[in-house]
Each structure stands twice: as C-alpha cells, then as structure tokens.
Amino acid sequence: MGTDHVASVDWAARAARQPLPSGLVIDGESRGASSTRPVVTPRDGGTIGQVPWASAQDADVAVAAARRAFDTGPWPRLHPRERGEVLQRFAEVVEAHRDELALLVSLEMGKPVRVAHEVELRALIRTLRFYGEVADKENGEITPTGEGELSLVTREPAGVVAAVVPWNFPLTLAGWKFAPALAAGCTVVLKTAEQSPLSMLRVAELALEAGLPRGVLNVVTGDGAEVGRRLGEHPDVDVLTFTGSTAVGRHFLRYSADSNLKRVYLELGGKSPNIVFPDAPDLEAAAATAAWAIFFNSGEMCTAGSRLILHRDIAEEVLERVVAAATAWVPGDPLDPSTRMGPLVDERSMSRVISQLEAGVDAGAEVLVGGRRIDDGREGPYLAPTVVSGLAPDNVLVREELFAPILSVVTVDDEDEAVRVAGDTPYGLAAAVWTSDLGRALRVSRRLRAGTVWVNCYEEGDLSVPFGGVKLSGFGRDKSRHALAEYSDLKTTWISYG
C-alpha cells in the first residue's frame, strides 16, 4: 500500500457498494437466523442493511458445534506449531481484506475509517501473528521426585470458550479473546455486540478461508439478555470471557454460579485517573496527551483518561492547554480520512450522556468547553468534546464511567491528595502519572490500584504485556503469553515406574 493508502480511497463510494455478511457463522457454514435486525450506522442514522439476529436456540447450535469440534475434531489435537501456522495464515487473510474490514467497523460503530484501518485492523493482525508465534512456546514442567517416580505438569486446552465482546473496538477486543483461546487449542463461540455485528461475522468467514476447521470459531449475533445469558448459563461452555460493563459482568458471575461453575474472566469498566505533577517533563505534551486520552475513539474506551488530576501549581496552565486542544478534536464524518473523532455509537448513548451531563451541571460542574450535541444540520449522534471542572467528589461526572468525550478535571495540593483522589473510585483499570522524578513515578505507581500504570505517556503498550483490571474493573488478563493461561488447564501426571 502507498504512503497514505487510506486517503487514496473513496470510502463513501465504497460503502455504497459494500456487501454485508449475510449469515451467522456456525460449524463452518454461513447460516440464517429466525429473525433479522436492521444495522443502523451512527454516521448519519441511516439503515445500511439487515443482519441475521441469533436466538438462544442459535447459541445452543453454536455451542454444540464448538463442543463437537473440541471433543472429536482435529484442532485441540494438532501440534501447537500447526495451530500457530493456521493463525499466521489467518493474519495474512485479514491483511488482504483490511480495507473491507475497516469500512465495516467504521460503518457499524462510527469509528473514523483511518483509525479503523491503522489502529483496529493493525491490532487484530498483530494479535493473530503474536499468538501464531507463541502457540508452541509454552512448556510443561517436570518436578523433583524420588527414585522410581516421575511427575509431569502439563497445560491442556480448557475446552469450549464463550467470548462476549463490546462494540467500541469490535475486532481488537475480539482478537484478544479468540486468538489466545485458539492458540491454546480451545474452540470458541463469540457473540458480537448488538451495535457491531458486521465486522466480526466477516472475520469468521475469513477464518474458514485461512483453514480453521469447522466448528472451531463460531460467531453469533443477538441480544445480550438472551444470547449472552444463554452462553453464560450453558453447561457445555467451559470458560466465559467478557469485556463490557461492570453490571453485565456481575450477571455472568451469577450465570456461572447457577450452572456449571464455568471459569469467568472479566474486563469491565474504568474511570482512569491521569495525574500531572509540576515536575512533568513536558507540560505541553501532558496536556495534548490528556486530550487524546479522552477524545480518541470519542471517549468510548474502557481505559479513557476521563479524570485529569492536576497539581494546583500547574493546573491553570495545563487546563488552558487542554481546553485549547479540545477545540481541535472536531467530530466529523467517519468515512472522511481526515476525521479524527466520529459520532457516539448510537442515539441511546447520546441520550444517556446528555442526561449525565445535565445532572453533573445541576450538581455544580462548570462546562469549560463543549457540553452539547453538535447541531449543525448533520444527522447522527455527534457530541462536542467536553471539559468540565468544579466537581464535588460525588458528582456523577467524577463517579460514573461515561463512555463519551467528557473530561473531568480535579485540582489537588500534593502527592498524597493526588493518590487519594485517584483511588476514590470503585474501578481499577488504568492510571497515568506525569513526573520527572523517578522515585515519585515508582512510588505513586505502586500506590495506585490499577491493572496498568503509564508514566509520562498514555495508552502505550504491546501485545507482550498483559491487560486487565482490579476492583470493579474485573479480573483475568488479555494479551501477552499470560492470556494463554486463561484458556488452559494445569494437569499433574504422577508416574510410578520403579
């Protein structure tokens, strides 16, 4: 591809002729469902097609296919190297269809097509390649024993995995689930989010082109209350992994308790603090990054830096720069390659966010910029980038995960107060610290209860490091070789031969 391939494509024209997936992918086949549902694009609120809408019965069929593929099929019995080779081919096929998949992501959930192409698809391709590489790198153990005895500790695939994924990164987060599960030798039933069914259905079709055996990766749509619940309660599901809200995560724990006690891994909400101290190495960079951390992906990120905690000595300077930076994040047409920020995912999200904003203002919050729906004649749920201050500790804009481009700013007097304010949340997904003092960086990082802490940066990382949270942000880890442990069982084999 050229130096700016994304800019060279007429994405709107391509969207007009883009075919949509026509079936659920179950047992290696594209299948219809008993009903369909319109796909509404947040780009302009228009209907772009129909998608088959799965029921609990369809989920049963998908689980049965995954169960057969695990119990009697070749996938768990392949040499791990061979599974890795299939995942590498899978990555190549996805790469060949990168434009198509980026367009589907942009259409279904409003992500700017450049971000879909350069971030979302890059992440999925790298995830497939990473787990293709490490599939045969996990070793067992031989532990010390007495004469005439041998003990073996091996990792075996856990079985059928149900993955329930969100709409905000419909391929990135799905890949973080199904790629390590497949590498470990499991079979998968993945339920798409209601708002973003298209891209993952197409990826499942491409998996078959890459040589994944039938029944190994099954993808269904459907309502969470019906299909998600059925997967959570299904006795033939061995592991359930979920990314989404804390409220829904609680349901999955109940479903497990009421069924077969399947293992459950949860990556849930966040209200991540971004702390800037006076000795930050570059206040301009800190301010620009603070804006990026909340306005990227329209703030629809579980790790969004939604709470900016500023030391009083530099609060005015940094806040002025953040407000200026916010004005540069202009929501636009997601199919325009120059757009940095698109709409919210749907009108329901817009209504919820506006209600939360109004409640926050009624409780004393001051809107410094934004705080309104963009009303310039365009269709679609476009929200202006928003910065608010003057927040009491119990203000809804400080306490709740908004999943929107809304930055809440709090001023503190010292390090202890910064840590206390940062920790005054039920969540513990991520945090950031800006300081030139290595001692302070390490000290504050240790004191913050979060799955990831960034120092002098935000949202940096790699597939080689794990991702997940603590407290109400969940448990279990995506990414890295550590994720393979979530989809495998440890077995001890003790042999007496003397």
Task: Report the location of each language-model feature.
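ALDH superfamily catalytic-core signature
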Residues: 247-392, 455
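Terminal low-complexity tails and localization/encapsulation signals of metabolic enzymes
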Residues: 1-51, 85-89, 139-162, 265-268, ...
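Short, well-ordered beta-strand elements within core beta-sheets of diverse protein domains
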Residues: 47-54, 71-76, 163, 274-278, ...
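Glycine-rich loop-to-alpha-helix module at the N-terminal edge of alpha/beta enzyme cores
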Residues: 45-138
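Residue-level signal for inorganic ion chemistry
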Residues: 45, 83, 105, 128, ...
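Conserved C-terminal structural/oligomerization subdomain of aldehyde/semialdehyde dehydrogenase
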Residues: 46-49, 237, 275, 330, ...
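Rossmann-like NAD(P) dinucleotide-binding subdomain of oxidoreductase/dehydrogenase enzymes
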Residues: 139-285, 412
